[in-house]
Regions:
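Major-groove recognition helix of helix-turn-helix-like DNA-binding domains
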Residues: 20-33
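A short, amphipathic alpha-helix used for macromolecular contacts
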Residues: 1-20, 64
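Extended, low-complexity cationic-aromatic segments
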Residues: 6, 10, 54-133, 137-140, ...
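Active-site proximal helix-loop segment of RNase H-like, two-metal nucleases, encompassing DDE(D)
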Residues: 191, 199-218, 231-233
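Acidic/histidine-rich, metal-coordinating catalytic segments
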Residues: 150-164
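Short, basic/hydrophobic alpha-helical segments
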Residues: 134-154
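RNase H-like polynucleotidyl transferase catalytic core
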Residues: 98-103, 176-198, 214-215
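C-terminal domain-tail junction helix/linker
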Residues: 45, 85, 220-258
Length: 258
């Protein structure tokens, strides 16, 4: 390399190699710097109301299952229906299934999931929409179909704008809602803390085992989901919650505010 390629002079007896090295950009260590990766994390100041709700949930999660007052966690998620443009090539010994990246959008539907984590029972339902009416009828199923013998259900939910008593009143009227609410205790996660709802864990498992693939119709989704739900219930698949109040105070106390 010419000694003046960098636009600077070189003192007699010095090495142009040293100058070149000093102007080279250090190589990025592929194990240390991955600028294309990002992590989403939402942790706000934890108010007394946040802590009150969190402590209540963590206390309930420690208790044994009570069939008269079952603890049930509920959540919902949208599912995009997709149809393959071309038939996939089925898997064979030594060869994975192959499918084309192109697909047709066939609309969306909604999946309700409720789980009694200590009992190992879950209940799912597919609806066309995620409106107040859909929520109300899923709650009706929980009370009258799935837990008819319970004195009341302790129902854990997030703060979605349909997850309130008003949805029941709008759908069934005040008298029927009063009857239902005598058998319900709504328990809400803190805002921005849906991770405290064990139904999210069940939905993640559902996506990995059942609904994470392309499904082209509501009917096929309902059949597939019903079979998965039955298998999980037959095996009494429970969720063991390990995060305690002590863990919360240790990990989150720096965010606590008075």
């Amino acid at each position: 390399m010419d000694e003046y390629d960098l636009g600077i002079g070189v003192a007699p007896g010095s090495s142009s190699k040293a100058i070149v090295e000093s102007y080279e950009t250090p190589a990025l260590n592929e194990n240390e710097c991955k600028p294309w990766l990002r992590k989403m994390w939402c942790i706000q100041k934890i108010t007394p109301e946040y802590r009150k709700r969190m402590y209540r949930l963590l206390g309930l999660y420690k208790k044994d299952y009570d069939s008269l007052h079952p603890l049930v966690c509920m959540d919902e998620k949208s599912k995009q229906l997709l149809e393959d443009n071309r038939h996939p090539i089925v898997a064979r010994p030594g060869s994975l299934e192959k499918y084309d990246y192109e697909y047709k959008r066939k609309g969306t539907c909604n999946i309700f999931v409720a789980i009694a984590p200590k009992a190992g029972m879950r209940y799912t339902k597919v609806t066309d929409t995620r409106k107040k009416r859909d929520f109300a009828y899923f709650i009706l199923d929980l009370v009258e179909k799935h837990f008819p013998e319970a004195e009341y259900i302790q129902l854990v939910m997030d703060n979605l704008n349909t997850h309130f008593e008003g949805s029941l009143i709008e759908t069934f009227g005040e008298q029927k809602t009063k009857e239902l609410m005598r058998k319900l205790r709504f328990i809400y996660t803190p805002k921005h803390a849906s991770w405290l709802n064990m139904a999210e864990i069940e939905i993640n498992i559902m996506d990995r085992q059942c609904t994470g693939t392309r499904i082209e119709s509501k009917e096929n989704l309902s059949v597939t989901l019903e079979k998965w739900t039955e298998d999980r219930n037959e095996n009494k698949c429970t969720i063991e919650w390990k995060f305690t109040r002590q863990h919360a105070d240790k990990k989150l106390s720096k965010h606590y505010v008075a």
